[in-house]
Amino acid sequence: MAKLSSINKNEKRKKLVKQYAAKYEKLKAIANDKSLDETERLIARLKMAEIPRNANPTRVRNRCATTGRPRGYYRKFGINRIELRDLGNKGLIPGLTKSSW
């Protein structure tokens, strides 16, 4: 089990990303638009710098839904490899079977 503070910090970041997503995307589009004047693009970049760092989507870490483990995460299931194996062996994940050939 991961530290509760790490899990809570990541949840807070997810909330911030969601809150600032529209504003961030709009400013990013303006900053990357080559057809606009350089001063407009600079202003957009300065406004982007005012947005909190934790509102950047790259700072969010994928974590297991059950344990909070940050490594070995499977996006399709939302859990880590260890939980995937345990739940798969118990038959709790529909359609997941042990391979045999």
Curated annotation (Swiss-Prot):
Binds 16S rRNA, required for the assembly of 30S particles and may also be responsible for determining the conformation of the 16S rRNA at the A site. GO terms for biological process: translation. It comes from Erythrobacter litoralis (strain HTCC2594). InterPro entries: Ribosomal_uS14, Ribosomal_uS14_bac/plastid. Keywords: Ribonucleoprotein, Ribosomal protein, RNA-binding, rRNA-binding. Belongs to the universal ribosomal protein uS14 family. This is Small ribosomal subunit protein uS14. Part of the 30S ribosomal subunit. Contacts proteins S3 and S10. Pfam families: Ribosomal_S14. One of its GO terms (molecular function) is rRNA binding. GO terms for cellular component: cytoplasm; small ribosomal subunit.
